[in-house]
Amino acid sequence: TSSCAIINGILNNKNLFYHNAVVTCDDRKKTLCQEPITIWFTGLSCSGKSTIANELDKLLNKNGYHTMILDGDNIRLGLNIDLKFSNDDRIENIRRIAEVAKLMNDAGLINIVSFISPLEINRIMAKQIIGDKFFLVYVNTSLEECEKRDKKGLYKKARNGEIKDFTGINSPFDIPKNADVIVDNIDYKECANKIYNAIEKRIKL
């Protein structure tokens, strides 16, 4: 793909050299008194990813942790405003946010990433970039329920052919094979607590 060609071209550029920071990730996490992690939410549009992510953010903040939420729509309105929904652009969308998440982990932060990220191969790519700090949460809300919640009418537009490549309708969603936590969003506070309990020992320094 063209995205891969660009990335490979950059990686093979012999005029670029990686500079190591004087203040290390270990130094930064000691300052913040926490182990950095990227909690990566995946699920259909309207599954409840952002709602649960925000509740988890509140819970972590209440317990003294330093966090940052990276939301799919917000990123597409800023950093990734040049990307659309072709296969190449979807790959680049995930690649960029994974690189941002890695940088934030290097800064000692706990990331909460809320992206549809529908394809298994793209989630694998994100995990390869982020490394062992990657923690996958699958919000397992049915397509029927997501359509009921859709106040923007996006699913209806997709079914009417007004939106192309819409995940769950005319574009696939691969159910994660190895999610660290699966939640169903029946109660978003319970979901946030379940995730918090799963990561609590991991983020304590």
Label the predicted regions.
Residues 69, 134-138, 180-182:
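Conserved beta-strand scaffold positions in the cores of enzyme catalytic domains, especially
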